[in-house]
Amino acid sequence: MKKIEMEGKSDDWCKNALARFRNVDQTSTQLAPAEKRTVEKTGEKRVRIIGPPEEKTCFTLALTVNANGAKYLAIVVFKTSSKTGKIPSHVLKSYNIPENVIVMGSRSGWWTKELDDEYIHLMYPENQDAPTFLLRDHAPVHTRNMAAALLKKKNVTQIFVPNCRIDEFQPPDATVNRTFKASFASKYHAWMSSPDRKQTKTGNAQNPSKTQFIHWVSEAWNEVTTECVKAGFKEACWKHISDEN
């Protein structure tokens, strides 16, 4: 890997260089993760483990960050039965979606090639004036010729994170995901232990609504700071770039 020399460069040069590097990470999550904690008070003789119903529904969450510390809109992908894979506009409106979140749909609930193409146009609405780089893993939808062609047309080069070293080279895995997941989990557990939560007839907590889930994502994403994002790139990428020739 070619060494990037930034010493002696102006602040503006460094800022412009860092702004050219983005990283996106898609991860599957559950609307109602399995609960192993008790919600009883400390000291109770009988302790019940009350969790949501057994049926779990998976969703995909995509988080994009920039080496300069910027964050982009968090993307939530819900499973939909629509033939087009699109969520109807009136349903989207009912979610009361926060400004820092985009909600999309697919028939599988996974990140599809159609969503990936839409993502590329969303992230890069115009061709980039200077060479720009997008760091991603080797997911099949990322390695498509169509994805490479779309990015190349916009002057964006795709850099694949080595499969065997994702935890080491993927910026979100270093700090961003850890911070986000901890915040999201704390909100879920607070909801689980709330006396106001609704329960089913059998005493199980009802699954959180999609609207609730979206707002947890929004709040947790807001809690990921610029410093956290920069630290992720420093730990995952730049320490390797500066050490290799």
Predicted regions and their residues:
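Phosphate-facing sequence motifs and polybasic nucleic-acid/acidic-lipid-binding regions
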Residues: 1-244
